[in-house]
Amino acid sequence: MIAFRFPVKTLTATRLFAEHIAQAYPTQKAILFGSRARRSEHDEGDADVAIILKGAIGPFIKTKMAMNDITYDILLDTGIRIQPLPVWEAEWAHPQNYSNPYLLYDIARDGIDLASRFNEF
């Protein structure tokens, strides 16, 4: 894979998001996926971030909506819209049991662990 530097706004927004999520949820990791991870994003495109959560599988919609509340403040601060995807560690470990296993396969293949990129600041 060719190394590249993320745009500062993307790093700022995803770092803020990951920090806020880690304060609210037991988080294993945050993974950027989709167009920003593939470097094919548009100026107005969102940043898709999978949040791998520790513990028992919880209520998806309730968790996603709570994460969306956090993303709104980050949008106002950075101009970057984040689309969170909560995934529990059991789902991540066994994607074949997830409602959309191919999405998790794609994230595992193309996604970028954000913790490894935050040192670019």
Model-derived regions: residue spans:
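Catalytic core of pol beta-like nucleotidyltransferases
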Residues: 1-29, 38-40, 54-121
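Glycine-rich beta-strand-to-loop/alpha-helix junction loops that act as flexible
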Residues: 33-35
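Short glycine/proline-enriched turns and hinge-like loops at secondary-structure junctions
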Residues: 42-45
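Short beta-strand->loop micro-motif that forms the acidic, two-metal-ion catalytic signature
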Residues: 47-52
